[in-house]
């Protein structure tokens, strides 16, 4: 895996030279004509990006910002769609194939449900890449490249830091039912920090998330650490522990302006960053390179965009990028 991580690092460094501030697009369903010149030979390609984004999650704003930046640079018609229901996401994939797009980038949070639809692209000559989730299954369904974090490694790395800090018991908050990547993260945490218990919440109902975490803290005062897998859930966890008068420490995956402030304010110990902007950028950029020059990245292996840690030691350096919606 060293070579793929090295590649991702190099790409990140190069990308920072061309990044411009991108505005958040929130929950819009489509990104028509996100073009701006740069297409090879004057040809504009249509690329579909299909994710399992759920309403209200700001995480995907950075995915889209990266994708839109790559589309703008290469004159690509980027067609974004999403549905957290895996069967409906599979339908969106089939719709993209039927519309004869030039390439497809997709997340595989539920690979058995979405993968069979994706596999239909290769026989009709549509190249596909997977990003964010699906590291263990992307090749099975015909995708040539994967861009994202190794979720097991990320979880283990977080668990190791908890163990080194002397924690006693952790709860790992799973906010999307059936999302294999989240389960893998928690399993990774438990591998390095054995006394870890999963807690299922409904990530689309933040008041409920806060009350569920608060009730768990009140029920079990031995909890020393709260591991959240999403920046919005982290904010709810900070509020829950404050209201419960708990001394538990909060750690999280992913960044947001609120998480940045909470790391600076010592309310969150650290964030495990998978660099979603980079995931979106590379997913679109790689398809353009494949279509125009026959390139592939990673040498048949996943290209890792994480894990990397953001904590008190480096938060001031990264805060500006987070404010630009690029970290």
In which residue ranges do the predicted regions lie?
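Hinge/cleft segment of the Venus flytrap/periplasmic-binding protein
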Residues: 12, 23, 43, 192-193, ...
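Flexible loop/hinge segments that line or gate small-molecule binding clefts
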Residues: 112, 116-153, 256-264, 268-269, ...
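Secretory targeting and sorting signals
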Residues: 1-26
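Hydrophobic alpha-helical segments within soluble ligand-binding/sensing domains
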Residues: 89, 145-170, 208-210, 255-259, ...
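Bacterial lipoprotein signal-peptidase II cleavage site
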Residues: 19-39
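Hydrophobic alpha-helical
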Residues: 90, 106-122, 189, 203-261
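Extracytoplasmic "Venus flytrap"
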Residues: 44-70, 74, 79-90, 108-111, ...
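Short, solvent-exposed amphipathic alpha-helices that sit
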Residues: 58-73, 154-158, 180-198, 212, ...
